[in-house]
């Protein structure tokens, strides 16, 4: 697994306010844990720790809604 911003299918981050929201999202996707990273590179976004390799992560480039 890897530590990364979990991404939606359009390469967009999951915006957040609460750590609990991200921890639920990350663990549901197989990560060990997750939290809401405040004021990071992509604003307030969910960061997952030890996320499985088959789960999409935010990569450089545009986010397409």
Swiss-Prot record:
SMART domains: Knot1
A GO term, aspect molecular function: sodium channel inhibitor activity
Keyword Chloroplast in record: no
Intracellular or extracellular location(s): Secreted
Cellular component GO terms held in the UniProt record: extracellular region
CDD domains: neurotoxins_LC_scorpion (cd23106)
Organs and tissues of expression: Expressed by the venom gland.
Gene Ontology biological-process annotations: defense response
Stretches assigned to the LCN-type CS-alpha/beta domain: 2-64
InterPro entries: LCN-type_CS_alpha_beta_dom, Scorpion_toxin-like, Scorpion_toxin-like_sf, Scorpion_toxinL, Scorpion_toxinL/defensin
Annotated coiled-coil segments of the chain: none
Gene3D superfamilies noted in UniProt: Knottin, scorpion toxin-like
Domain remarks in the Swiss-Prot or TrEMBL record: Has the structural arrangement of an alpha-helix connected to antiparallel beta-sheets by disulfide bonds (CS-alpha/beta).
Family the entry assigns: Belongs to the long (4 C-C) scorpion toxin superfamily. Sodium channel inhibitor family. Alpha subfamily.
Listed name of the protein: Alpha-like toxin Bom4
Annotated organism of origin: Buthus occitanus mardochei
